[in-house]
Every structure is written in C-alpha cells, then in structure tokens.
C-alpha cells in the first residue's frame, strides 16, 4: 500500500506557487525559511547539515513542518520529494518576497558584481507591449536554465560548486531620476 501511495503522490502535479498561508508559515521561523530555501534548491539533508548551523533535530523539525505545510513529502532517512516545481515563484506581494525586499535585496545589490563569473546589468528602454511578453518568457527560461544547471551540478563534490544567486526582473517602470526630468504637457 505504501508503494501505491508513493506512486500516486509522485503523479500529483507540482505547485507553481505557494499559498499565502504556506508562505506565512515559512517566514514565521528563520530556520524553517533556511530549510525551505534549501529544499526548493533540492539540497540533500546531509548537505544542509554540513553547510548550515542546524542540529539534526532542528532539521528534522523543519522538514516535518514543510511536510505538514505541503511543500515536501518527507520520506524515511530525512529524504523528501519536493511538491513545488523547481521553477516555482514566490507570491509577488507575499510574505517571502516581502522578506527578500526587506532583508535581502539591499545586501545583494550592495555587492560589487566584479568577482569571477559575476555581472550586473541594468538596461532601460521602451519596447512594444507585445514584445514585452516575449522578453518576459525568455527571462523565465533563463531562470529555468539556471535552476536546471543547479540540479545537474548537484552531482559535483561540494568543493567544486559555489553559491550563485540570479535576480531576474522586468517591469514597466521609470526610475525617479528620469521621471522627475520628464516633460509634462505644460512644458
């Protein structure tokens, strides 16, 4: 019966985003958030313990909570099956993105982006609305390619991998410095 239940669970579609309640639960506890980020990156329990200051009991507690919340299906030996797609996105105005905006973005962009394999590029332009969707889809594919490479490189020894984070964004927006200088109909 357990094998049948596992096969049924394995055929369930993966979530593309979490619910508001799931995200609230994740950000309510810093250790749970760290473990949630690790499992959405599909890191094995052994690597999480080797990398972060967590006891095995704290990890098991977090994995159990993530199972209860519906983000993973916890299996024997602290193994798990992710219930969210690798390319899932946090709710744009949800608790996790609010956490990132408040506590992560400044730290991320304060870096020099001048290290090996690093870059920062800000491009401003005006394009047709139809092409904007095409660019958005291409940017989403870049994010998915990065996620796929991360998964493929999990077979490399830890000392041959480095953590990278990409932030991909595109929105109809004009920075304040440009907006302040923009001509009005009265000019």
Region annotations inferred by a language model:
Residues 39-52:
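Short acidic, hydrophobic short linear motifs in intrinsically disordered regions
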Residues 16-28, 44, 74-99:
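Short, cationic-aromatic polyanion-contact patches
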Residues 3, 90-187:
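Long, low-complexity, charge-rich intrinsically disordered regions
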Residues 8, 28-29:
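A glycine-rich, hydrophobic loop/mini-helix early in the fold
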Residues 1-10:
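Short C-terminal boundary/hinge segments that cap the last helix of small helical domains
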Residues 43, 61-62, 71-74:
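A contiguous binding-surface segment within folded domains or other stable secondary-structure elements
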Residues 30-34:
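Pre-recognition alpha-helix immediately N-terminal to the DNA-recognition helix
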Residues 54-69:
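Short amphipathic alpha-helical interaction segments
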């Amino acid at each position: 019966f357990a094998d049948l239940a596992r096969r049924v669970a394995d055929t369930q579609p993966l979530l593309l985003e979490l619910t508001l309640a799931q995200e609230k639960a994740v950000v309510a506890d810093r250790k749970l958030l760290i473990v949630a980020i690790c499992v959405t990156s599909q890191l094995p329990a052994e690597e999480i313990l080797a990398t972060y200051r967590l006891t095995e009991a704290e990890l098991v507690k977090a994995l159990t909570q993530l199972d209860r919340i519906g983000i993973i299906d916890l299996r024997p030996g602290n193994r798990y099956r992710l219930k969210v797609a690798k390319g899932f996105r946090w709710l744009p105005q949800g608790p996790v993105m609010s956490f990132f905006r408040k506590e992560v973005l400044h730290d991320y962009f304060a870096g020099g982006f001048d290290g090996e394999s690093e870059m920062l590029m800000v491009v401003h332009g005006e394009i047709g609305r139809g092409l904007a969707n095409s660019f958005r889809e291409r940017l989403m594919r870049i994010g998915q390619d990065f996620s796929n490479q991360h998964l493929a490189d999990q077979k490399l020894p830890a000392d041959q991998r480095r953590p990278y984070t990409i932030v991909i964004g595109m929105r109809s927006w004009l920075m304040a410095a440009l907006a302040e200088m923009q001509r009005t109909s009265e000019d």
